């Protein structure tokens, strides 16, 4: 009973190890690596199973044989496993049979062939009895089936293992301890990372990972807050100011609206004009002129900074920085007023957000003014509520009209828009052509599939018809074989009878009775046997069980046939 308990305990521990691996690494999860504690548990259970109640055998040189010798003896008869055997034998650093057996287990786990290898090893029960005692679970049919079922479940788990380890002669590699303690204490090296494993990114305590700001709103808000701080009244250092202007220029370029946004806004302006809404053409022209003026001021500041940097003297004064800040705030206020008059339905939005959009989306304002400038033929009627609001702005910005007209008449921007539109149209045509080609390919594949389906059905029908015909022919051949067997038996029986008659005639001397071997005299009555034809005296023909005209031998055979 104690032996049965030990056997069941070994089988149960192996099942638990397999279930732990399936729970942690099954269903397409990450592969099992050297640092997995479940791997160490599984390898230990497999080694205990293969070493339990193993008979002691020694080689020619006196070395003790282990379960590797059993696996090698069982698998070398199968051609499909010669490559694995040669791979294990080619590892010169493994000196013992125990180390080679461990390497073979790891190789089968990595290739998903452990269950198949074990099943091939257990196909020959006589060989298994030569290597293992009666207490081994490998000799019990029920436990053997349970073990193979558990091992076949591991075929769906990926194992990422090092197949050429020189330290398997000593023990199984135990890298899971390195997670809790340093490698210097344990004395074992840390395993290398598998290919494709992401590298760790280490940050200091005060650092944070910065994600790219796609919208650019946080950068703009920080820039605006910095413009409003009183620290900007102080003169900036010459080494930091050019980089600041470069960053602002790059942010303004990266935040330019794409062509789709421009088309949407242009359609909105056209709908407003058709509905008779407010027409902010003059206000947009004034804001465009002010923006152009601020741009020219920024260029002057940049040129001054560049010249001073080359000469190595001077710095940018605080008044110019304040002027730039005031220009940005003025453009924000003008854009807020224009947006409030053009789109009354958008009053729920925050004014600060609209101001930031106006500050850094200068190409949007230029595109809108260009569209309004090209549509000079459309009627422009200003309502009375607009007259009081825009009259002051028109008087103040009357000197900036020529500059705005130059911006409107600039054909370079229109050419850029036309190029972008042509590129988008080309991309659309290419995508439509690709879609059409894919649809044609899909239709062809469907037709081919239908054709193949019809051919498959025809082949199946033909195969069924041939199968029925072959079955009929097979039945006929079976009947013929049975008839031939019966005829052969009849011929054999007839041959035996003829041989028996011939033997009887050859043994009986002429002039003697077949039954009692009596010598016939001149007056003795004699009768021929009606079956074999031999001469029988009157006593033998009448007294033998009342069978007349029959010798005793033929009478016995006839009795046997009747029974």
Swiss-Prot record:
PROSITE patterns: RUN, ZF_FYVE. The keyword Membrane does not apply. Induction: Up-regulated by IL4/interleukin-4 in bone marrow-derived dendritic cells. Zn(2+) 1 binds at residues 513, 516, 537, 540. One of its GO terms (biological process) is positive regulation of macroautophagy. Residues 196-205, 263-284, 297-312 have a biased composition (Basic and acidic residues). A zinc finger (FYVE-type) spans 428-558. It is found in: Cytoplasmic vesicle, Autophagosome; Lysosome. Residues 176-327, 375-397 are annotated as: Disordered. The RUN domain and the FYVE-type zinc finger are essential for its function in the positive regulation of macroautophagy. The RUN domain is involved in interaction with RAB7A and LAMP2, while the FYVE-type zinc finger is required for binding to phosphatidylinositol 3-phosphate. Forms homodimers (via coiled coil domain). Forms a ternary complex with RAB7A and LAMP2; the interaction with RAB7A is mediated by RUFY4 (via RUN and coiled coil domains). Interacts with GTP-, but not GDP-bound ARL8A and ARL8B. Interacts with dynactin/DCTN1 and the dynein intermediate chain DYNC1I1/2. This is RUN and FYVE domain-containing protein 4. It comes from Mus musculus. The gene is Rufy4.
């Amino acid at each position: 009973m104690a032996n049965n308990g030990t056997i069941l305990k070994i089988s149960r521990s192996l099942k638990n190890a397999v279930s732990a691996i399936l729970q942690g690494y099954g269903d397409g999860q990450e592969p099992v690596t050297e640092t997995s504690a479940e791997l160490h548990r599984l390898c230990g259970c497999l080694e205990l199973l293969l070493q339990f109640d193993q008979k002691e055998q020694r080689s020619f040189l006196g070395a003790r044989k282990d379960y590797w010798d059993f696996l090698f003896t069982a698998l070398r008869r199968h051609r499909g496993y010669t490559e694995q055997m040669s791979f294990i034998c080619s590892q010169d650093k493994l000196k013992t049979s125990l180390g080679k057996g461990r390497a073979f287990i790891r190789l089968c786990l990595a290739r998903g062939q452990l269950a198949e290898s074990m099943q091939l090893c257990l196909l020959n029960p006589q060989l298994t009895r030569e290597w293992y005692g009666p207490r081994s679970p490998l000799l019990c049919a029920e436990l053997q089936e349970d073990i193979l079922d558990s091992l076949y479940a591991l075929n769906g788990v990926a194992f990422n293992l090092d197949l050429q380890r020189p330290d398997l002669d000593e023990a199984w590699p135990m890298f899971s301890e390195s997670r809790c303690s340093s490698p210097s204490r344990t004395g074992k090296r840390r395993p290398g990372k598998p290919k494709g494993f992401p590298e760790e990114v280490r940050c200091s305590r005060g650092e944070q990972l910065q994600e790219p700001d796609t919208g650019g709103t946080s950068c703009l808000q920080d820039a605006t807050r910095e413009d409003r701080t009183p620290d900007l009244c102080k003169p900036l250092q010459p080494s930091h100011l050019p980089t600041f202007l470069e960053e602002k220029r790059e942010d303004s370029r990266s935040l330019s609206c794409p062509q789709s946004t421009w088309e949407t806004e242009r359609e909105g302006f056209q709908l407003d004009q058709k509905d008779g809404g407010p027409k902010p053409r003059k206000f947009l022209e004034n804001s465009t002129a002010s923006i152009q003026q601020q741009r020219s001021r920024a260029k002057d500041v940049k040129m001054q900074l560049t010249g001073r940097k080359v000469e190595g003297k001077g710095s940018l004064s605080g008044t110019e920085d304040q002027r730039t800040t005031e220009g940005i705030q003025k453009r924000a206020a003008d854009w807020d007023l224009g947006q409030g008059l053009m789109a009354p339905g958008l009053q729920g939005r925050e004014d600060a957000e609209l101001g930031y959009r106006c500050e850094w989306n200068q190409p949007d304002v230029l595109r809108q003014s260009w569209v309004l400038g090209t549509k000079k033929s459309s009627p422009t009627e200003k309502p009375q509520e607009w007259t009081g609001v825009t009259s002051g702005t028109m008087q103040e910005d009357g000197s900036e009209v020529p500059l705005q007209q130059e911006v409107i008449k600039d054909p370079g921007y229109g050419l850029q828009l036309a190029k972008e539109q042509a590129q988008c149209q080309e991309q659309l045509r290419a995508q439509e052509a690709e879609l059409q080609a894919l649809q044609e390919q899909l239709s062809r594949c469907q037709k081919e599939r239908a054709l193949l389906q019809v051919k498959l059905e025809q082949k199946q029908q033909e195969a069924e018809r041939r199968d029925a015909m072959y079955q009929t022919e097979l039945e006929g051949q079976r009947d013929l074989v049975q008839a031939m067997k019966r005829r052969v038996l009849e011929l054999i029986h007839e041959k035996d009878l003829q041989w028996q008659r011939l033997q009887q005639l050859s043994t009986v001397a002429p002039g003697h009775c077949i039954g009692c071997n009596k010598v016939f005299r001149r007056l003795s009555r004699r009768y021929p046997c009606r079956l074999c034809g031999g001469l029988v005296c009157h006593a033998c023909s009448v007294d033998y069980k009342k069978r007349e005209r029959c010798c005793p031998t033929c009478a016995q055979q006839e009795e046997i046939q009747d029974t």
